[in-house]
């Protein structure tokens, strides 16, 4: 029997505390290919302890050869669950503020080739704590990649607390994962039944081909590495919020048709970011050497339509995002402002670049429709004053897309009333309260107003009272909507108290003595005075060459003023694409 006990305990990694051999032997059938082999066996019982607890092994030893044919533990244990908390060190604002340890939610954990995901508190329950689990910076809504690789590491499933830190990932990878999950959760809080973005969006981090930027493209969000004086853009969470906002526009706007207008796309992406942070500055800490640097700010900078519409989508988007931010400030509730905003995604106002006046006015109208509680916006809405005031601060009124056409007057006879004619085309005629001609005489600081009266159809007219010879009359035209907000000011911004544009001017009782238009009436102007020591920016007379900064912002006009003319005076044509100041008047 001692030989049977020795064979039964062979290769057992635990010491045996008790052993016995049954008196009666048994027959053990062992299946083969087409038959059974029958072995006379001794039955051996071994008592020991393994890594889980006590063990009672039943062993069958061949009575003739002494070979161990079977050994099993008769004590059955319930497998222990693994209750694991997963967290990571991230930047919650920007790298100039301290990093924080946060729960990593919706993160993938693989155990025994089965995938599990952490819950809203970073917890995951595995059915067993045996073996290793693999933790990925990938989950239900974000798949972080650096150079195509998903950060991951293994750890014993018995570890109850898992930390993503610099030993297994970079802080830009972790911050990107955290931020994308944040903005997805924010989006779902507004569109809980929409599942079109319930997938792990590819989140590419620390792209080294450029710097100082981030972008959305075809269902991916992408962040450049540190460089050029800028942070790794993945380290600034609201940059990820903005880029994911483009995904929302792509997948949800206008029943999934997407968004066409560039300014609207950028502005609404900013709205998604600001509505999550409830902070009016985007991308704060952008530059490595300046904690106050940022991408855009909406508390101290006011972009106004139409004068700040420059044809650059990010700048043009600031107008509509600013209107949203001030709607939030006026209402005092972010959720109330969001309730108005998310209705746009079904209404879908949109259009090509250059039609922002129409689109932004349509958005104002949609906000009022969303706010309305009786099916009639013409009798007002509960929060119309707050909404209209917020949009008006950014030059958006119910008449922003009105077209006011007027041929400028430059002279008048003395002692006769001055006729001012205009044509007004309205998308929302119900929104027009009145149209006015504002004028002032000579050096007066006070504007008088005269209502424009309907002549017929869309034609309007007013009369500036007769003036004496030698008088200079300044004037501009404007519409007023039913909320008292000015719109369609012509020339634009002529009504402003601070930094106004030039109004129109009428010379009363003047007679033309000489005319210099550089085309048909050439006077005695000389250019490039001999004593001028400037090397560039010299005055010339010729055909102007239009130049633009970044092919968008005008530096020199390509046009001249004289009807059917070609020439004008300018400070140097630039045909080489030089700097914007190469030919300005300072030489």
Task: List the predicted regions and their residue ranges.
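Edge beta-strands of extracellular beta-sandwich domains
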Residues: 142-158, 486-494
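Glycine-centered loop-to-beta-strand initiation motif
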Residues: 112-135, 139, 147-151, 456-460
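Extracellular protease catalytic domains of secreted zymogens
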Residues: 151, 156-402
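Glycan-association/targeting regions that enable binding to alpha-glucans and other polysaccharides
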Residues: 387-527, 531-539
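Exposed beta-strand face motif in extracellular beta-rich ectodomains
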Residues: 40-42, 133, 363, 471-477
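Surface-exposed loop/turn motifs at beta-strand-loop junctions within extracellular Ig-like
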Residues: 48, 137-141, 479-483
